[in-house]
């Protein structure tokens, strides 16, 4: 479970997130809506660890484990415990194959995982057929699947 309590963020002197409270339970899916410049991307970047919070509390509570304070954790550490997102621009390596993109994500993620072993392909079987194709040659939908698979590794 992800829990945010009174989270604040500033860009310089500009207050970009004001006392944000959010609870996301296992299996839930939420949408964050708002006009341009309202803090949606800032919120996601704070949760993922790409931006620091100025104040407030962010905790991650995995099933069967005590709540963990996310504040001191790096983006890589947060990714290792299962926190990630797919940005709008997808950020795949366009000159690398699907399989190479997944191997890079695995190297930065969970030790001992193996993309060619097929675990990720069980969740994204379409990617298996495309595993030798370069990212640039994939359709937009396939690029999003690859980006999502990378985020979930």
Predicted regions and their residues:
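The feature captures the beta-strand-to-loop junction immediately N-terminal to the Walker
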Residues: 33-35
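Short beta-strand immediately N-terminal to the Walker A/P-loop
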Residues: 30-31, 85
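Conserved ABC nucleotide-binding domain
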Residues: 70-72, 120-139
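ABC ATPase NBD Q-loop/coupling interface
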Residues: 57-80
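ABC-type ATPase nucleotide-binding domains, specifically the catalytic core motifs of the NBD
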Residues: 12, 52, 75, 98-115, ...
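ABC ATPase C-loop
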Residues: 151-152
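Conserved structural motif at the start of ABC-family nucleotide-binding domains
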Residues: 2, 17-19
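Helix-to-loop junction immediately C-terminal to a conserved catalytic motif
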Residues: 48
